[in-house]
Amino acid sequence: MKLLLLCLGLILVCAQQEENSDVAIRNFDISKISGEWYSIFLASDVKEKIEENGSMRVFVDVIRALDNSSLYAEYQTKVNGECTEFPMVFDKTEEDGVYSLNYDGYNVFRISEFENDEHIILYLVNFDKDRPFQLFEFYAREPDVSPEIKEEFVKIVQKRGIVKENIIDLTKIDRCFQLRGNGVAQA
């Protein structure tokens, strides 16, 4: 277990150093996270995890900071073609800005600001029983973002080893908006 945590720490430190080299990416101020978010992109080095019926094909609705520094989030996903909701709690780790979660394996992730505090990227490393994989989730405060911001995200994840075929633009699919409490219609 100690070896796993050491490897994980090294992965996240390297990812953070890479992020710091990009002008567009910064550590996110967690005090600003509470509220509605929309899933814009999913990207992974294991595409089947984010394809239709993949375990990581989830759509964010709300994220809230909890008093104990953990995060609470509500997500939607499709199960047998039906939209369903489920909550998650992300536990704060000892490393600043890093959270963990048991979901389809053990996950550790960092939240980074992208362009401004209206856009965030979750960089997640999953240690499942089969093999580890990385996942990038791009969230925004609005249901869609400009083509320029989308292009920037694609460049960022490609620099981190994700091939274009493993990047899914979620704005072009049903993201289960009908379950959201705000009445947003799917485009």
From Swiss-Prot:
Cystine pairings recorded for this chain: C83-C176
InterPro entries the record matches: Calycin (IPR012674), Lipocalin (IPR002345), Lipocalin_CS (IPR022272), Lipocln_cytosolic_FA-bd_dom (IPR000566), Maj_urinary (IPR002971)
CDD domains: lipocalin_MUP-like
Subcellular location: Secreted
GO cellular component: extracellular space
Tissue note: Expressed in liver and in sublingual and submaxillary salivary glands. Highly concentrated in secretory fluid such as saliva and urine as well as in hair dandruff extract.
Coarse class of the protein's main subcellular location: secreted
Signal peptide (UniProt feature, chain positions): 1-15
Modifications made to the protein after synthesis: Several N-terminal ends may be due to cleavage by signal peptidase at different sites or may be generated by proteolytic processing of the secreted protein. Analysis of the sugar composition shows the presence of GalNAc, Gal, NeuAc, GlcNAc, and Man. May be also O-glycosylated.
GO MF entries: odorant binding; small molecule binding
Keyword annotations of the record: Allergen, Disulfide bond, Glycoprotein, Secreted, Signal, Transport
Residue positions with a glycan: N53, N68
Subunit field text: Homodimer.
Family: Belongs to the calycin superfamily. Lipocalin family.
Protein name in the entry: Major allergen Equ c 1
